[in-house]
Amino acid sequence: YSAVFPFIKYAADLMVQKYHVDPKLAGTIPGLLPIGAIILTPLFGSLYDRIGKGATLMVIGSVMLIFVHSMFALPILNVWWFATVIMIVLGFAFSLVPSAMWPSVPKIIPEKQLGTAYALIFWVQNWGLMGVPLLIGWVLNSYCKGPVVDGAQTYDYTLPMTIFAMFGVLALIVALMLKAENKKKGYGLEEANIQK
């Protein structure tokens, strides 16, 4: 979540600064992400129920996060349509990971401790939702200022996007650890929830 929700806070400005999108339309491209999630998350959840592969889906989603933020960081194809395509891929990743992550929790944690487990997950997420925007804002102001153009400060988003990509790397490491632990302990993360 730290690679997505805090990113959305800065995404409209990224669209203006890097992709030269009209400021009046800059929120439209990041706005595709929640619209896509509304449609895709239930579909991916249903897919997980039918085929399983929860840890694998989390790995795939994490790789997609790394790819998206790396593409936003690289100085290539600085045009609106590329940003739109990359944002749609981010919507896929953002839908894929939670649709596999949340149903995996009761497979790992005993039922009598589920409340504590979910509370701890939200606690960690909220630290990220509080701290990551502060970190990105500090990085932008300290290391990424460009020239003032028409009275407005410009920013280079390469370093912040690299930081978001590193959160994707962290998510990938956790997903791979879950996959390995599942192999050892047989939690059933790769098994379908709907048994025929």
Indicate residue ranges for each PLM-predicted region.
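Juxtamembrane helix-start elements in MFS-like secondary transporters
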Residues: V21-P30, V79, A83, D156-Y157
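Multi-pass alpha-helical transporter architecture, strongest
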Residues: A73, Y157-K196
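A late C-terminal transmembrane helix in Major Facilitator Superfamily
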Residues: E111-K145
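Extracytoplasmic gate region of multi-pass secondary transporters
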Residues: Y1-T41, P98, W102, V132-P133
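C-terminal transmembrane helical hairpin of 12-TM major facilitator-type secondary transporters
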Residues: G54-M101
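A membrane-interface helix-boundary motif in multi-pass transporters
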Residues: W138-G168
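Helix-to-loop junctions at the C-terminal end of transmembrane segments
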Residues: L40-K53, L140
